[in-house]
From Swiss-Prot:
CDD domains: flavohem_like_fad_nad_binding. Consists of two distinct domains; an N-terminal heme-containing oxygen-binding domain and a C-terminal reductase domain with binding sites for FAD and NAD(P)H. This is Flavohemoprotein-2. It comes from Giardia intestinalis (strain P15). Residues 171-278 form the FAD-binding FR-type domain. The record marks Y30 as: Involved in heme-bound ligand stabilization and O-O bond activation. The gene is hmpA-2. FAD binds at Y210, R227, Q228, Y229, S230, M449, F450, G451, P452.
Amino acid sequence: MALSEDTIKAVEATAGLIAAQGIEFTRAFYERMLTKNEELKDIFNLAHQRTLRQPKALLDSLVAYALSIRRINELYELKGKDLPWTGHLAELQGFFSVAERVANKHTSVGIQPAQYQIVGAHLLATIEDRVTKDKAVLAAWGKAYEFLADLLIKREEEIYAETEGPEGGWRQTRTFRVEEKTRVNEVICRFRLVPAKGGASVVQHKPGQYLAIFVRNPELFQHQQIRQYSIMSAPNSAYYEIAVHKDGAGTVSRYLHDHVDTGDLLEVAPPYGDFFLRYLEAGEQTAADTQASSEFQMLQGRAVNFAAEKTAPIVLISGGIGQTPLLSMLRFLAQKEGRETARPIFWIHAAHDSRVRAFKEEVDAIREAALPSLRVVTFLSEVRATDREGEDYDFAGRINLDRIPELARLEAGHANPHYFFVGPTGFMTAVEEQLRARSVPDDRIHFEMFGPFKASH
Protein backbone atom coordinates (compact mmCIF):
# COMPACT_ATOMS: atom_id res chain seq x y z
CA MET A 1 0.00 0.00 0.00
CA ALA A 2 1.46 3.33 -1.10
CA LEU A 3 2.11 6.15 1.35
CA SER A 4 0.44 9.54 1.00
CA GLU A 5 2.35 12.73 0.23
CA ASP A 6 1.50 14.08 3.69
CA THR A 7 2.96 10.98 5.33
CA ILE A 8 6.17 11.21 3.31
CA LYS A 9 6.62 14.92 4.04
CA ALA A 10 6.08 14.42 7.78
CA VAL A 11 8.67 11.63 7.94
CA GLU A 12 11.19 13.57 5.85
CA ALA A 13 10.72 16.66 8.01
CA THR A 14 11.44 14.84 11.27
CA ALA A 15 14.27 12.58 10.08
CA GLY A 16 16.77 15.33 10.85
CA LEU A 17 15.41 15.73 14.37
CA ILE A 18 15.99 12.05 15.07
CA ALA A 19 19.45 12.17 13.50
CA ALA A 20 20.38 15.19 15.63
CA GLN A 21 19.73 13.20 18.82
CA GLY A 22 22.23 10.59 17.71
CA ILE A 23 22.45 7.28 19.52
CA GLU A 24 20.72 8.78 22.55
CA PHE A 25 17.46 8.34 20.63
CA THR A 26 17.98 4.69 19.78
CA ARG A 27 19.51 3.92 23.18
CA ALA A 28 16.32 5.28 24.78
CA PHE A 29 14.28 3.15 22.39
CA TYR A 30 16.12 -0.05 23.32
CA GLU A 31 16.03 0.70 27.05
CA ARG A 32 12.30 1.22 26.87
CA MET A 33 11.60 -1.88 24.78
CA LEU A 34 13.87 -4.27 26.67
CA THR A 35 12.50 -3.05 30.01
CA LYS A 36 8.85 -3.45 29.04
CA ASN A 37 9.33 -6.61 26.93
CA GLU A 38 12.02 -8.56 28.73
CA GLU A 39 11.38 -11.64 26.59
CA LEU A 40 13.19 -9.84 23.77
CA LYS A 41 16.42 -10.05 25.77
CA ASP A 42 16.48 -13.67 24.59
CA ILE A 43 16.85 -12.38 21.02
CA PHE A 44 18.84 -9.14 21.07
CA ASN A 45 22.60 -9.18 21.52
CA LEU A 46 22.92 -7.42 24.87
CA ALA A 47 26.67 -6.99 24.38
CA HIS A 48 25.92 -4.80 21.36
CA GLN A 49 23.63 -2.73 23.57
CA ARG A 50 26.44 -2.11 26.04
CA THR A 51 28.93 -1.17 23.33
CA LEU A 52 26.25 0.94 21.54
CA ARG A 53 26.79 -1.00 18.32
CA GLN A 54 23.13 -1.90 17.95
CA PRO A 55 21.80 1.60 18.78
CA LYS A 56 24.25 3.08 16.25
CA ALA A 57 23.18 0.60 13.57
CA LEU A 58 19.48 1.25 14.17
CA LEU A 59 19.97 5.02 14.05
CA ASP A 60 21.80 4.83 10.73
CA SER A 61 19.18 2.51 9.23
CA LEU A 62 16.22 4.52 10.50
CA VAL A 63 17.49 7.84 9.19
CA ALA A 64 18.54 6.33 5.85
CA TYR A 65 15.07 4.84 5.42
CA ALA A 66 13.39 8.16 6.24
CA LEU A 67 15.54 10.02 3.74
CA SER A 68 14.89 7.43 1.01
CA ILE A 69 11.21 6.93 1.71
CA ARG A 70 9.97 9.00 -1.23
CA ARG A 71 11.90 6.98 -3.82
CA ILE A 72 11.01 3.69 -2.13
CA ASN A 73 7.34 4.64 -2.20
CA GLU A 74 7.55 5.64 -5.87
CA LEU A 75 9.01 2.25 -6.75
CA TYR A 76 6.18 0.38 -5.04
CA GLU A 77 3.56 2.68 -6.53
CA LEU A 78 4.85 1.82 -10.00
CA LYS A 79 4.92 -1.89 -9.17
CA GLY A 80 1.36 -1.71 -7.89
CA LYS A 81 0.21 -0.18 -11.18
CA ASP A 82 2.20 -2.67 -13.30
CA LEU A 83 4.28 0.19 -14.68
CA PRO A 84 8.04 0.07 -15.38
CA TRP A 85 9.85 0.32 -12.06
CA THR A 86 13.28 -1.26 -12.43
CA GLY A 87 14.88 2.09 -13.26
CA HIS A 88 14.38 3.09 -9.62
CA LEU A 89 16.27 0.06 -8.33
CA ALA A 90 19.80 1.27 -9.08
CA GLU A 91 19.49 4.36 -6.88
CA LEU A 92 17.89 2.28 -4.11
CA GLN A 93 20.45 -0.52 -4.24
CA GLY A 94 21.96 0.64 -0.95
CA PHE A 95 18.58 0.48 0.79
CA PHE A 96 17.69 -2.97 -0.52
CA SER A 97 21.18 -4.29 0.25
CA VAL A 98 20.80 -3.20 3.88
CA ALA A 99 17.25 -4.59 3.97
CA GLU A 100 18.56 -7.92 2.67
CA ARG A 101 21.23 -8.04 5.35
CA VAL A 102 18.69 -7.18 8.07
CA ALA A 103 16.25 -9.81 6.79
CA ASN A 104 18.94 -12.49 6.88
CA LYS A 105 20.00 -11.51 10.39
CA HIS A 106 16.35 -11.51 11.52
CA THR A 107 15.70 -14.99 10.14
CA SER A 108 18.86 -16.29 11.81
CA VAL A 109 17.49 -15.31 15.24
CA GLY A 110 13.93 -16.38 14.43
CA ILE A 111 12.13 -13.02 14.28
CA GLN A 112 8.35 -13.39 13.81
CA PRO A 113 5.77 -10.89 12.44
CA ALA A 114 4.21 -10.26 15.87
CA GLN A 115 7.52 -8.93 17.15
CA TYR A 116 7.42 -6.15 14.56
CA GLN A 117 4.31 -4.82 16.29
CA ILE A 118 6.17 -4.64 19.61
CA VAL A 119 9.12 -2.83 18.04
CA GLY A 120 6.80 -0.41 16.23
CA ALA A 121 4.90 0.50 19.38
CA HIS A 122 8.12 1.32 21.27
CA LEU A 123 9.56 3.24 18.33
CA LEU A 124 6.50 5.49 18.16
CA ALA A 125 6.52 5.95 21.93
CA THR A 126 10.18 7.00 21.77
CA ILE A 127 9.44 9.48 18.98
CA GLU A 128 6.61 10.90 21.08
CA ASP A 129 8.83 11.16 24.18
CA ARG A 130 11.87 12.67 22.51
CA VAL A 131 10.94 14.24 19.15
CA THR A 132 7.33 15.40 18.85
CA LYS A 133 3.88 14.90 20.30
CA ASP A 134 2.20 16.00 17.07
CA LYS A 135 -0.48 13.36 16.39
CA ALA A 136 -0.24 13.74 12.61
CA VAL A 137 3.52 13.22 12.63
CA LEU A 138 3.21 10.20 14.91
CA ALA A 139 0.56 8.74 12.63
CA ALA A 140 2.85 9.31 9.64
CA TRP A 141 5.72 7.48 11.32
CA GLY A 142 3.33 4.67 12.21
CA LYS A 143 2.38 4.24 8.55
CA ALA A 144 6.00 4.49 7.42
CA TYR A 145 7.07 1.85 9.93
CA GLU A 146 4.22 -0.46 8.90
CA PHE A 147 5.29 -0.03 5.26
CA LEU A 148 8.87 -1.07 6.10
CA ALA A 149 7.77 -3.89 8.40
CA ASP A 150 5.55 -5.38 5.70
CA LEU A 151 8.45 -5.32 3.25
CA LEU A 152 10.80 -7.08 5.69
CA ILE A 153 8.21 -9.61 6.88
CA LYS A 154 7.55 -10.64 3.29
CA ARG A 155 11.26 -10.99 2.50
CA GLU A 156 11.95 -12.90 5.72
CA GLU A 157 9.22 -15.42 4.94
CA GLU A 158 10.84 -15.96 1.54
CA ILE A 159 14.20 -16.60 3.21
CA TYR A 160 12.63 -18.98 5.76
CA ALA A 161 11.05 -20.92 2.89
CA GLU A 162 14.32 -20.99 0.96
CA THR A 163 16.22 -22.75 3.76
CA GLU A 164 13.32 -24.96 4.83
CA GLY A 165 12.40 -26.33 1.41
CA PRO A 166 15.50 -28.15 0.10
CA GLU A 167 16.63 -31.56 1.33
CA GLY A 168 18.18 -31.21 4.77
CA GLY A 169 16.53 -27.84 5.35
CA TRP A 170 14.66 -26.61 8.40
CA ARG A 171 13.05 -23.54 9.95
CA GLN A 172 13.92 -21.88 13.28
CA THR A 173 16.32 -24.14 15.22
CA ARG A 174 17.43 -27.75 15.03
CA THR A 175 19.51 -29.80 17.45
CA PHE A 176 23.10 -30.53 16.40
CA ARG A 177 25.81 -32.57 18.06
CA VAL A 178 29.43 -31.48 18.34
CA GLU A 179 31.14 -34.29 16.43
CA GLU A 180 34.62 -32.79 16.80
CA LYS A 181 36.11 -29.97 18.83
CA THR A 182 39.67 -28.99 17.98
CA ARG A 183 41.80 -26.35 19.67
CA VAL A 184 43.48 -24.56 16.76
CA ASN A 185 45.56 -22.25 18.94
CA GLU A 186 45.28 -20.45 22.27
CA VAL A 187 42.34 -18.29 21.12
CA ILE A 188 40.55 -20.31 18.40
CA CYS A 189 38.51 -23.53 18.65
CA ARG A 190 37.03 -25.36 15.71
CA PHE A 191 33.71 -27.21 15.91
CA ARG A 192 32.26 -29.76 13.51
CA LEU A 193 28.47 -29.92 13.90
CA VAL A 194 26.27 -32.78 12.69
CA PRO A 195 22.52 -33.34 13.14
CA ALA A 196 21.75 -34.95 16.49
CA LYS A 197 19.56 -37.42 14.63
CA GLY A 198 22.09 -39.80 13.12
CA GLY A 199 22.25 -40.02 9.34
CA ALA A 200 20.19 -36.89 8.73
CA SER A 201 21.37 -34.47 6.06
CA VAL A 202 21.84 -30.70 6.23
CA VAL A 203 20.92 -28.07 3.67
CA GLN A 204 23.99 -26.95 1.74
CA HIS A 205 25.12 -23.43 2.57
CA LYS A 206 26.38 -20.85 0.12
CA PRO A 207 30.13 -20.32 0.65
CA GLY A 208 30.41 -17.27 2.90
CA GLN A 209 27.22 -17.72 4.94
CA TYR A 210 26.93 -18.14 8.72
CA LEU A 211 25.14 -20.23 11.34
CA ALA A 212 23.37 -18.80 14.37
CA ILE A 213 24.10 -20.71 17.58
CA PHE A 214 21.50 -20.50 20.39
CA VAL A 215 22.89 -20.94 23.90
CA ARG A 216 20.93 -21.09 27.15
CA ASN A 217 22.62 -21.76 30.50
CA PRO A 218 20.92 -20.12 33.51
CA GLU A 219 23.91 -20.90 35.72
CA LEU A 220 26.18 -18.70 33.59
CA PHE A 221 23.91 -16.06 32.03
CA GLN A 222 20.37 -14.94 32.66
CA HIS A 223 19.07 -14.79 29.10
CA GLN A 224 19.40 -16.91 25.99
CA GLN A 225 22.34 -15.81 23.87
CA ILE A 226 22.45 -15.98 20.05
CA ARG A 227 25.60 -15.49 18.01
CA GLN A 228 26.41 -15.88 14.34
CA TYR A 229 29.54 -17.75 13.26
CA SER A 230 30.71 -18.06 9.66
CA ILE A 231 30.80 -21.55 8.17
CA MET A 232 34.35 -22.51 7.19
CA SER A 233 33.67 -25.87 5.53
CA ALA A 234 32.88 -26.30 1.85
CA PRO A 235 29.17 -26.74 1.07
CA ASN A 236 28.10 -30.34 1.74
CA SER A 237 25.09 -32.31 2.98
CA ALA A 238 26.60 -33.92 6.08
CA TYR A 239 28.00 -31.27 8.46
CA TYR A 240 29.01 -27.68 9.13
CA GLU A 241 32.29 -26.45 10.56
CA ILE A 242 32.75 -23.18 12.41
CA ALA A 243 35.69 -21.62 14.22
CA VAL A 244 35.19 -19.50 17.33
CA HIS A 245 37.64 -16.84 18.46
CA LYS A 246 37.68 -16.53 22.25
CA ASP A 247 36.97 -12.91 23.06
CA GLY A 248 37.91 -11.90 26.59
CA ALA A 249 34.57 -10.13 26.99
CA GLY A 250 32.58 -12.50 24.78
CA THR A 251 29.86 -14.37 26.67
CA VAL A 252 29.16 -17.01 24.03
CA SER A 253 32.69 -17.45 22.67
CA ARG A 254 33.98 -18.12 26.19
CA TYR A 255 31.09 -20.51 26.85
CA LEU A 256 31.79 -22.50 23.67
CA HIS A 257 35.51 -22.67 24.45
CA ASP A 258 35.21 -23.56 28.12
CA HIS A 259 31.93 -25.47 28.50
CA VAL A 260 31.06 -27.19 25.19
CA ASP A 261 32.83 -30.43 24.29
CA THR A 262 32.61 -33.26 21.79
CA GLY A 263 29.23 -34.97 22.08
CA ASP A 264 27.41 -31.94 23.48
CA LEU A 265 24.24 -30.63 21.83
CA LEU A 266 23.62 -27.15 20.43
CA GLU A 267 20.56 -25.48 18.94
CA VAL A 268 21.36 -24.13 15.49
CA ALA A 269 19.49 -22.07 12.88
CA PRO A 270 19.93 -22.79 9.14
CA PRO A 271 22.67 -21.07 7.12
CA TYR A 272 21.88 -17.45 6.34
CA GLY A 273 23.69 -14.36 5.14
CA ASP A 274 23.87 -12.15 2.06
CA PHE A 275 27.68 -12.27 1.74
CA PHE A 276 28.57 -15.31 -0.35
CA LEU A 277 30.26 -16.47 -3.54
CA ARG A 278 27.61 -16.89 -6.21
CA TYR A 279 28.35 -19.82 -8.50
CA LEU A 280 25.55 -21.09 -10.74
CA GLU A 281 26.27 -23.51 -13.57
CA ALA A 282 24.44 -23.06 -16.88
CA GLY A 283 20.73 -23.67 -16.40
CA GLU A 284 21.07 -23.90 -12.62
CA GLN A 285 18.77 -21.79 -10.46
CA THR A 286 18.61 -21.55 -6.69
CA ALA A 287 15.54 -21.36 -4.48
CA ALA A 288 16.60 -17.80 -3.67
CA ASP A 289 16.26 -16.81 -7.32
CA THR A 290 12.77 -18.26 -7.67
CA GLN A 291 11.30 -17.35 -4.29
CA ALA A 292 12.66 -13.83 -3.81
CA SER A 293 10.25 -10.98 -4.45
CA SER A 294 11.05 -9.16 -7.66
CA GLU A 295 13.05 -6.24 -6.23
CA PHE A 296 15.35 -8.55 -4.25
CA GLN A 297 15.47 -10.98 -7.18
CA MET A 298 16.71 -8.14 -9.39
CA LEU A 299 19.52 -7.39 -6.94
CA GLN A 300 20.50 -11.06 -6.82
CA GLY A 301 20.48 -11.17 -10.61
CA ARG A 302 23.05 -8.37 -10.67
CA ALA A 303 25.42 -10.32 -8.43
CA VAL A 304 28.48 -11.77 -10.11
CA ASN A 305 28.11 -15.39 -11.18
CA PHE A 306 31.62 -16.82 -11.03
CA ALA A 307 30.57 -19.99 -12.85
CA ALA A 308 30.02 -17.77 -15.91
CA GLU A 309 33.09 -15.58 -15.32
CA LYS A 310 35.61 -18.43 -15.48
CA THR A 311 38.69 -16.21 -15.81
CA ALA A 312 37.75 -13.45 -13.35
CA PRO A 313 40.51 -13.19 -10.71
CA ILE A 314 39.40 -13.62 -7.09
CA VAL A 315 41.30 -12.01 -4.22
CA LEU A 316 40.36 -13.24 -0.73
CA ILE A 317 41.57 -10.87 2.01
CA SER A 318 41.09 -11.60 5.71
CA GLY A 319 42.01 -10.23 9.09
CA GLY A 320 42.13 -12.58 12.08
CA ILE A 321 39.14 -14.92 12.37
CA GLY A 322 37.62 -13.17 9.33
CA GLN A 323 39.22 -15.84 7.19
CA THR A 324 36.53 -18.43 8.06
CA PRO A 325 33.91 -17.45 5.43
CA LEU A 326 36.70 -17.00 2.89
CA LEU A 327 38.00 -20.50 3.70
CA SER A 328 34.59 -21.82 2.70
CA MET A 329 34.90 -19.93 -0.59
CA LEU A 330 38.43 -21.21 -1.18
CA ARG A 331 37.44 -24.81 -0.48
CA PHE A 332 34.44 -24.43 -2.78
CA LEU A 333 36.63 -23.11 -5.62
CA ALA A 334 39.07 -25.97 -5.05
CA GLN A 335 36.21 -28.46 -5.43
CA LYS A 336 34.55 -26.76 -8.39
CA GLU A 337 37.60 -25.76 -10.42
CA GLY A 338 40.71 -27.24 -8.82
CA ARG A 339 43.80 -27.64 -10.97
CA GLU A 340 41.79 -26.75 -14.07
CA THR A 341 41.01 -23.25 -12.85
CA ALA A 342 41.66 -20.54 -15.41
CA ARG A 343 41.50 -17.71 -12.90
CA PRO A 344 44.19 -16.21 -10.67
CA ILE A 345 43.26 -16.70 -7.00
CA PHE A 346 44.94 -14.84 -4.12
CA TRP A 347 44.78 -15.65 -0.41
CA ILE A 348 45.92 -12.61 1.60
CA HIS A 349 45.79 -12.89 5.38
CA ALA A 350 46.74 -10.49 8.16
CA ALA A 351 47.34 -11.69 11.73
CA HIS A 352 48.74 -10.12 14.87
CA ASP A 353 51.53 -12.68 15.13
CA SER A 354 52.37 -16.25 14.15
CA ARG A 355 51.08 -17.67 17.44
CA VAL A 356 47.49 -16.63 16.69
CA ARG A 357 47.60 -17.11 12.96
CA ALA A 358 45.24 -19.99 12.17
CA PHE A 359 44.66 -22.42 9.31
CA LYS A 360 48.02 -21.90 7.55
CA GLU A 361 48.45 -25.65 7.12
CA GLU A 362 44.96 -26.00 5.65
CA VAL A 363 45.49 -23.26 3.09
CA ASP A 364 48.85 -24.78 2.16
CA ALA A 365 47.18 -28.19 1.78
CA ILE A 366 44.50 -26.77 -0.51
CA ARG A 367 47.19 -25.19 -2.66
CA GLU A 368 49.19 -28.41 -2.80
CA ALA A 369 46.26 -30.70 -3.56
CA ALA A 370 43.94 -28.63 -5.73
CA LEU A 371 45.06 -25.06 -6.47
CA PRO A 372 48.80 -25.02 -7.23
CA SER A 373 48.54 -21.54 -8.73
CA LEU A 374 47.08 -20.09 -5.49
CA ARG A 375 49.11 -17.08 -4.39
CA VAL A 376 49.33 -16.96 -0.58
CA VAL A 377 50.47 -13.74 1.13
CA THR A 378 50.74 -13.23 4.90
CA PHE A 379 51.13 -10.02 6.88
CA LEU A 380 52.15 -10.19 10.55
CA SER A 381 51.79 -7.07 12.67
CA GLU A 382 54.44 -8.40 15.04
CA VAL A 383 57.26 -10.64 13.84
CA ARG A 384 58.98 -12.90 16.39
CA ALA A 385 62.65 -13.80 16.31
CA THR A 386 61.79 -17.39 15.33
CA ASP A 387 59.54 -16.40 12.39
CA ARG A 388 60.98 -17.09 8.94
CA GLU A 389 60.30 -14.63 6.13
CA GLY A 390 58.84 -16.39 3.12
CA GLU A 391 57.54 -19.26 5.21
CA ASP A 392 55.87 -17.91 8.35
CA TYR A 393 55.15 -14.51 6.82
CA ASP A 394 55.75 -12.42 3.72
CA PHE A 395 55.51 -8.89 5.08
CA ALA A 396 55.92 -7.39 8.54
CA GLY A 397 53.42 -4.73 9.58
CA ARG A 398 49.81 -4.01 8.83
CA ILE A 399 48.19 -5.04 5.57
CA ASN A 400 49.28 -2.97 2.58
CA LEU A 401 48.11 -4.13 -0.84
CA ASP A 402 50.69 -1.91 -2.55
CA ARG A 403 53.35 -4.36 -1.37
CA ILE A 404 51.91 -7.10 -3.60
CA PRO A 405 53.05 -6.28 -7.16
CA GLU A 406 51.02 -9.09 -8.74
CA LEU A 407 47.81 -7.24 -7.86
CA ALA A 408 49.00 -4.08 -9.57
CA ARG A 409 49.89 -6.09 -12.68
CA LEU A 410 46.43 -7.69 -12.75
CA GLU A 411 44.75 -4.31 -12.44
CA ALA A 412 47.03 -2.72 -15.03
CA GLY A 413 46.23 -5.57 -17.41
CA HIS A 414 42.49 -4.86 -17.06
CA ALA A 415 41.85 -8.27 -15.49
CA ASN A 416 39.44 -6.54 -13.06
CA PRO A 417 39.94 -8.73 -9.97
CA HIS A 418 37.10 -9.26 -7.53
CA TYR A 419 38.06 -8.51 -3.93
CA PHE A 420 36.33 -10.31 -1.05
CA PHE A 421 37.40 -9.15 2.40
CA VAL A 422 36.32 -9.79 5.98
CA GLY A 423 37.73 -8.79 9.35
CA PRO A 424 37.50 -6.42 12.30
CA THR A 425 36.31 -2.86 11.76
CA GLY A 426 39.73 -1.18 11.61
CA PHE A 427 41.07 -3.79 9.21
CA MET A 428 38.03 -3.48 6.96
CA THR A 429 38.26 0.29 6.83
CA ALA A 430 41.94 0.10 5.87
CA VAL A 431 41.36 -2.44 3.09
CA GLU A 432 38.40 -0.54 1.66
CA GLU A 433 40.38 2.72 1.64
CA GLN A 434 43.25 1.00 -0.16
CA LEU A 435 40.94 -0.44 -2.81
CA ARG A 436 39.26 2.93 -3.36
CA ALA A 437 42.69 4.54 -3.72
CA ARG A 438 43.49 1.96 -6.41
CA SER A 439 40.25 2.95 -8.24
CA VAL A 440 38.79 -0.54 -7.93
CA PRO A 441 35.17 -0.34 -9.23
CA ASP A 442 32.31 -0.77 -6.75
CA ASP A 443 31.09 -3.94 -8.46
CA ARG A 444 34.48 -5.54 -7.77
CA ILE A 445 34.39 -4.88 -4.02
CA HIS A 446 32.61 -7.42 -1.80
CA PHE A 447 32.84 -7.30 1.97
CA GLU A 448 31.29 -8.23 5.27
CA MET A 449 32.14 -6.29 8.41
CA PHE A 450 31.98 -7.82 11.87
CA GLY A 451 29.18 -6.38 14.02
CA PRO A 452 26.01 -4.54 12.92
CA PHE A 453 27.51 -1.38 11.40
CA LYS A 454 27.69 -1.92 7.68
CA ALA A 455 25.89 -3.98 5.10
CA SER A 456 27.61 -6.61 3.03
CA HIS A 457 28.57 -5.30 -0.36
